[in-house]
A protein has these predicted regions:
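Conserved donor-binding/catalytic core segment of Leloir-type glycosyltransferases
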Residues: 18, 157, 168-184
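N-terminal strand-loop element at the rim of the active site
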Residues: 21-27, 34-82, 211
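A charged, aromatic-enriched C-terminal amphipathic alpha-helix characteristic of glycosyltransferases
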Residues: 28, 292, 302-357
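Nucleotide-activated donor-binding/catalytic signature segment of Leloir-type glycosyltransferases, i.e.
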Residues: 71, 207-229, 237
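Acidic donor-binding loop of glycosyltransferase active sites
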Residues: 91-93, 233-250, 263
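Donor nucleotide-sugar binding/catalytic pocket of nucleotide-sugar-dependent glycosyltransferases
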Residues: 128-158
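Short alpha-helical segment that forms part of, or immediately flanks, the ligand-binding pocket
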Residues: 232, 255-260, 274
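Short hydrophobic beta-strand element within catalytic cores of glycosyltransferases
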Residues: 264-269
Length: 377
């Protein structure tokens, strides 16, 4: 039997909620779980206990240290090992964020709160509570039968930026992107940027935590970070966001961060996951669908054009206090059985058909670009 060695944990009469993270990285799952854990204590006055998969080779030590600085944080080899700590810490619930399919991340001894982030068939419902991450998922795939808990959107307060540090002139247009390492994977979008900087000298692209796809002094790649102040400096540096992820977003935290600062989102038209579009007014984003359309958008971009701040931006509703009241409502009340009707199954099926339409449109152009257009451009 495994010997469990843990640091002192203050005895408390507060309700203890455990949070499980399979990969400690710079991406949305880890970032959002940190904020839920933080405000579970600050707003809901509960106790947060962190578990993570210590066997995951992709863990970032700096992220683990960030959690350990704030919470009692314990590494385990698998999800079921958390049950060893049930009585020691009087765990009431275990929260886990995942794709949404039935798997081994569910406990028979601890009430498991499943927060899912990808479209799923309704037959995948499991756990003590099953909650989706966005109104797009809830409406398009569950007919609003599954409760919704959005991410918390929180930005550090500063007016400073990175232009001086990165040696970017004040009059330069700066278009930025941040997210997971593979979040800018559209080859034709990459090629468009490379072509544009050769022809247009007053534009610079800055990528945070994105895999490097070229070498040019005005296409800058910054290492990923868990430092929220640095992220805000990066956001302040940019005049707009360039989005180039083929899959799209089931919530779109990075898009929300840019939009919350009233910056235009330049997005791909044929993403399968389209929550980032659902949250915003059409005046807050512009979509490209080809190399030519993206080139024209970027070439004609005017940094002095201001967005109307009164236009729809539902990301602004994702403030800590408001989100944690939803967390309490959907996760911490008595279990309520979700009744699924034939209409709900039809809506779910229709959602997948629509998503596949976007996928087919995406594949058609990208194959055309790969085998024909890229050869002559």
């Amino acid at each position: 039997m495994q010997v469990v060695v843990v640091k002192h944990f203050v005895n408390t009469s507060l309700m203890v909620i455990a949070f499980y993270i399979d990969e400690m990285n710079f991406r949305g799952v880890a970032n959002s779980t940190f904020l839920y854990s933080k405000y579970n204590e600050v707003v809901l006055k509960n106790k947060s206990l962190i578990f993570y998969n210590k066997s995951n080779a992709n863990n970032k030590n700096v992220v683990i240290k960030k959690f350990k600085k704030k919470f009692k944080t314990i590494g385990v080899n698998n999800f079921s090992a958390i049950e060893q700590y049930l009585y020691k810490y009087k765990i009431k619930y275990i929260y886990t964020q995942k794709g949404g399919k039935k798997d081994t991340w569910v406990s028979n001894k601890i009430k498991t709160l499943v927060h899912y982030v990808y479209p799923q068939k309704l037959s995948e419902i499991h756990g003590y509570k099953y909650v989706c991450v966005s109104s797009w998922l809830g409406s398009q795939f569950t007919n609003n039968k599954i409760p919704i808990l959005p991410y918390i959107l929180e930005l550090k307060k500063t007016h400073k930026n990175l232009r001086k540090k990165l040696k970017i002139k004040k009059n330069q247009i700066v278009i930025g992107c941040h997210g997971g390492e593979s979040s800018f994977d559209l080859k034709f979008a990459q090629d468009t940027l490379k072509n544009l900087v050769r022809k247009k000298t007053n534009i610079t692209f800055v990528f945070l935590n994105i895999n490097k796809f070229c070498k040019h002094r005005r296409i800058i790649f910054l290492k990923g970070t868990s430092n929220e102040t640095f992220k805000r400096l990066f956001l302040n540096t940019c005049d707009a966001m360039i989005y180039g992820r083929s899959l799209g977003e089931s919530f779109g935290m990075a898009c929300g961060e840019f939009a919350s600062l009233n910056k235009l989102i330049i997005s791909y038209k044929y993403n399968r996951h389209r929550s980032h579009i659902d949250y915003l007014s059409k005046t807050r984003y512009i979509e490209y669908y080809s190399k030519k359309s993206l080139f024209n958008i970027l070439n004609n971009f005017n940094k002095n054009d201001k967005l109307l701040s009164n236009k729809k931006n539902n990301y602004l509703l994702c403030q800590p206090k408001a989100v944690m009241q939803i967390f309490k409502k959907v996760f911490l009340n008595d279990k309520s059985h979700v009744k699924i009707s034939i209409v709900d199954y039809f809506v779910n099926y229709a959602g997948f058909i629509k998503m596949n339409y976007y996928y087919v449109r995406h594949k058609i152009y990208n194959q055309y670009y790969k085998f024909f257009e890229s050869k002559f451009s």
